Amino acid sequence: MKIIRAIIYTVDLPTKGGGYRRTSGFSPDSNVSTIVQLDTDEGISGYGEVCPLGTHYGRGWGEASVSGANLLAKMIVGEDPMQIEKLNRLWDVKFKEDLYVKAPFDAALWDIAGKAAGRPVCHLLGGRYEGDIPMYRTVHLFKQHEDTPESWARRCQDYRAEGYQHFQLKGAATADATIATIEAVCDILAPGELALCDANGGWSFPDAVRIAAGVRNLPIIIEQPCRTMEECIEFRKRCWNPIKLDEVIETTQDLLRAWNAGAMDYCTIKISRVGGLSKARRMRDICVDLGIGAVPDDTWGSEFVSSALAHFAWSTPTKYRLNATDLTDYVTVVTADGYARGENGYLGFSDAPGLGLTPRMNVLGKPDYVVE
């Protein structure tokens, strides 16, 4: 089997309700997603997607993704799509850094492999593990005047009514306000529910220490308190709550450094940030071997990103799987049919071969690039 063609599309993904809030502020109301289609000489096509969240959040942005995808496509047309690890090593040599650009190509390879084998991608990633997968729900407050502890607690109760039991808060404007928000949400938690406070690396080290002291007796997981790994390692020494790291985990080396320093209890593995499903699987397996809780995740996207994420989550051993998410619930555009959406706070599953998706070509529109 050979890759004979790569087709690259871009789609704007407006956010439901407006800009998606992070501790550092608000993101754009819409983000550019890059969708890659790889065609083979045996008539099987695979799909993948990447959607960075603009220049304010992490490495990469939408316009860079599509330009990088055009360059990377030229390196793999003519190659055997079933040799996934070999292709990963090829583009790591020929295309340094910019891991997010590689993620949609890697997903497309797994999609092809699953379709060729007649198996869902999760089977190829290690197998589907038992048990339901709870989805965490990022709690949205779209207006600054809503930013009160009571509003955060009410929104958690709204999402509880939809079946969610895991609530992800965002840090408030000050350390005192963040402590008050965490207290208000923890006060309304029911048995079996879980709360996380995600700073997105936005807290200063002194504020992070103050917050940790203020919530040390509350059932809250602190997520990505500070911007750098060094700060997070030092923060761990001053925090009694469980810690989940996210933005500072980009490579296997980052994971091992954080573990060696005792800096985290849970590790978020965002597929696009680490360079695709292949690298994400490797990092997940290391987490399992080390006894660290894993959170299969991704930055943003539509059905293609969300399906890859779901298969990654289902192939993660139940004991080490904290939760996951369904990113289609945050955007207004549907790019493919066949996706098993989450319901009642739990992740969906499809046993269709590959990623199980049929693209909506009218949504994908005219290709930005075609490489043959």
Name each model feature, range by range.
Residues 2-4, 9-18, 33, 300-372:
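Flexible C-terminal active-site loop/helix
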Residues 169-172, 176-307, 342:
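Catalytic core of soluble alpha/beta enzymes
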Residues 133-151, 171, 200, 244:
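Active-site mouth loops of central-metabolism enzymes
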Residues 117, 121-144, 181:
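N-terminal small/glycine-rich loop or linker at the start of catalytic domains
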Residues 3, 36, 43, 72, ...:
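Conserved, mostly hydrophobic/aromatic
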